[in-house]
Design a protein with these regions (language model features):
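Acidic, serine/threonine-rich low-complexity regulatory regions at protein termini
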Residues: 1-295
């Protein structure tokens, strides 16, 4: 009897269990997702922190999934702590290293010396491990959470329908525009504070809907996408509006930064976020060269 050899893949969205995994991700994003209050005293520094994370990820050739996970950890940690200004950059870097340990190959995990141009050279590995431990303890060591990028990889496989390629000569052009636009909207979703309050699967579905609408594909929300995502078109209107508004305000004529890869090297079991915690101070040594601010 011939063996049924199946193609092996490290991408969960290409496996026969993709539907089950997607349902699992959606279940836990709803049950365990924290409430985001946008109340960090350093929230005005968020654009700089996100830009720094992207820059390091580009240098280390990290995936888009890793970037989204790092920003997610940073957002919720900042929202629940009164961080000193001179520790916030180190916290963002620690979130990136934790994300890399989950989503990336060990060789791509950034080293502390990567940040020497931003933080003090006096920062030791011991100090840095303490910061990482603070973050892990806050999330109760559950830091592999579903992000927009995780869901996007699954939804992208269901983006097109047969009627989209009525004119076959434009198929390659359409696919190229699709890939660039998806990445652009993902970047835009990272920049929006208001979108943090939405479930990642809803933001990802809104990116797909907005992209199809922008490309002029009819219908812009297909029955297949409705079935796969579990969302009706009307469910995504508000999220699409916020996404489009953010693109208009911040991404006009800005080249797409394709420095990091579009997908994760493989699926990691999503770890559940801890429940909402009481706001607290973080006790980290003064190890960053910048002006100290009061709690």
């Amino acid at each position: 009897m011939a063996l049924n050899h199946q193609r092996r893949t490290d991408k969960w969205w290409e496996t026969e269990y993709s539907d089950n995994i997607h349902s699992y991700l959606q279940y836990h994003e709803v049950k365990w997702r924290m409430v985001y209050g946008a109340r960090s005293p350093q929230i005005h520094l968020r654009p700089v922190l996100v830009k720094t994370i992207r820059s390091i990820a580009k240098t280390c050739e990290m995936s888009n999934v890793c970037v989204h996970l790092a920003v997610t950890l940073m957002d919720f940690f900042m929202d629940n702590h009164d961080l000193k200004f001179d520790t916030i950059m180190l916290v963002s870097f620690a979130c990136l290293t934790l994300a890399a340990k989950i989503e990336e190959h060990c060789l791509k995990i950034p080293k502390l010396n990567t940040m020497q141009n931003v933080i003090s050279k006096d920062v030791t590995n011991s100090h840095f491990r303490k910061v990482e431990m603070k973050i892990l303890m806050f999330f109760e060591f559950n830091v592999a959470v579903p992000t927009v990028a995780h869901f996007i990889e699954f939804y992208k496989d269901h983006f097109f329908c047969d009627s989209d390629f009525y004119h076959n000569e434009f198929a390659s052009i359409l696919k190229d525009k699709f890939n660039r636009m998806i990445l652009s909207y993902q970047d835009a979703s990272l920049e929006s504070i208001k979108l943090i309050s939405y479930n990642p699967s809803m933001v990802a579905a809104s990116i797909i809907l907005t992209t199809r609408h922008t490309l002029g594909l009819v219908p812009c929300w297909t029955p297949q996408l409705r079935k796969v995502t579990g969302y009706l078109k009307k469910d995504l209107v508000q999220c699409c509006s916020l996404l489009g508004r953010n693109v208009m305000q911040h991404r006009k004529f800005v080249p797409i930064d394709e420095g990091y890869l579009s997908s994760s090297p493989g699926f990691q079991s999503p770890i559940i976020m801890a429940s909402k915690k009481k706001r607290s101070h973080i006790d980290v040594p003064n190890i960053i060269l910048s002006k100290r601010t009061a709690f």
